[in-house]
Amino acid sequence: MPKRVLKGAAKRAREAKHARDAAKARRLSSFLNVRLNQEHIPHEILPNSASDDKLLDRPVTGADLFAPSSGPSSNSVYPSLLQEEYFWNYFWQTYHVSLCPILDDAQFKQHYQSLLIADGKGRKPSALVDIVVAACMQYHISTLPLGSQSGLVEGKDASVAGRWHYWRGQTLLTYELESLSISTLQCHVLCSIYLCGGSFHNMMDTAMAQAVRTAYILGLHRDLPSTLPEAKREMRRRLWWTVYFMDTRATMKLGRSFMLSESHSMPALCIDSLRVAASSGSTFVPADEDMTWLSFNLRQITLCRTFRAAYTSFHNTDFHLQEGQPIWDRPDALQAGAEIIAKHIPSLDAWCDSVPDALKLKRQDSNSRPFSTDGARVVLELSAPEWLQRQRMLLENTYHHVCVNLFRSMICFPYQPASQVHISENSLPGELATRCAAHAIALTKLTHQVLEETSLLDGWHEAFYCQWDAVMTLIGFVLAYPGSGTVTLEAKSAIHLAIAVSENFGFKFAVGTSASKIVQGLCAKSETLTANEYASAYIGASTQNANIYRIYGGQICGVIDWQNS
């Protein structure tokens, strides 16, 4: 590809990223411009990531996209067959058991063996194998320190490791457009995971759209007759509900509408019984009599259903706002929104109670309980299998992440000077804003402890993005409630922990380092604004007050742009 064409494509990629985050970055930069009398460019408060340009180029060596792997001495950019097996073996202990149980372990290995060429020097093309290898390369290389990362990244960031396998898999998928299969759907789901890890969020969204349409075309929204084999029925259910989960996660991440709608035509939820787990193709030992390795996936799905019910109810409500008016300009509308969200809190509590004890993270403080936001340190049972430890941690992480996204719309700027601001116990929006901050603090403390004491989250890109979401929420909370209240002080402390978390991730992939620098810069600006009692400065004129109010209403404290949702 000509160099200038590549540069132009890279520039468009950066602009696309900035367009995606415009509802956040533009408002925050505008606010800082006004309050600090300094120019802040929107993209300067977004982490630099692999999506800037590093997935746009092609192999420097081994330009034949379909050249078979031929051993460690080959000049091909693809790993040898032994190296491929080394990478895809990670899949079963990571993505398979902790994110997307959509492959049959035994069937995949049989499929891989069937691809091997007789002379043992290569294998036949397979989109599914390529994308599994790409995802596992991205994960594993992201667990290594920057100085120890393999030459397979070719000087690029670990988040784009495996990109040649990804591109080859994408090319192979084009041949399946008119002959869709279960394998096609599996590829689209895994592509979205790979793209999300590399922070290619628009491409991830497109991959998820393809997955949703493919799932409908394959009829996965309808259950198979009970006369067919249970293992086949359960695999189809797991595929459907994994697409459902990934669609929900994309909505939380991007603030866009759901692509897969709730309807009367939905398959039954997955079964996590010992019998079904035994026929799934995987051989993980049950952790308890009422819990198998499939229980984690089932609990994630039921949590997503609880979130979607609350999210849909809130965002489908007509608050009778004027054109261009955000909910944060109308205390009565904000109160009405808070009442809608509050109705779903018992459902979240019921979900916590429904989780099997074997999937819960115990606390070092015997008076604390799982999923709480009291700040108690968790017990990391290092003698438990790694897959089970990761499931426990990720389930609680997901719960806090869901609550942050659900309650964040209640954080807004007050009308009175900062010196008079406090979170009133009698204010329902204030209570939910406090809940939001508490969950962001809990997520941050949990992530920090796990990274400090274990390697469970090393290379886990989604944990980094959940942490980024939490710390930006905390910064918004501190700016909205800049007093010296207990929650604000705890939020400030958690922000500093979040910086340490980003730096930890930054030892493995560059976006972590970039995020750390951005948060440190925003902390400094927050301290400056607080010291100058910035809130009292913008009360002077009603028009100015409204503008500042809107900036934060949609920027940090609301995931989506209300007027364009």
Swiss-Prot record:
Molecular function GO terms recorded: DNA-binding transcription factor activity, RNA polymerase II-specific; RNA polymerase II cis-regulatory region sequence-specific DNA binding; zinc ion binding
Q: Where in the cell is it found?
A: Nucleus
- GO (cellular component) term, any one: nucleus
Its ancestry begins with:
Eukaryota, Fungi, Dikarya, Ascomycota, Pezizomycotina
- Where it mainly occurs, coarsely classed, is nucleus
Q: Does the keyword Zinc-finger apply?
A: no
Q: What Pfam families is this protein classified in?
A: Fungal_trans
User: This protein is called what?
Assistant: Transcription factor asqA
Write out the ranges of the annotated region (Fungal transcription factor domain). 204-273
Q: What's an example GO BP annotation here?
A: DNA-templated transcription
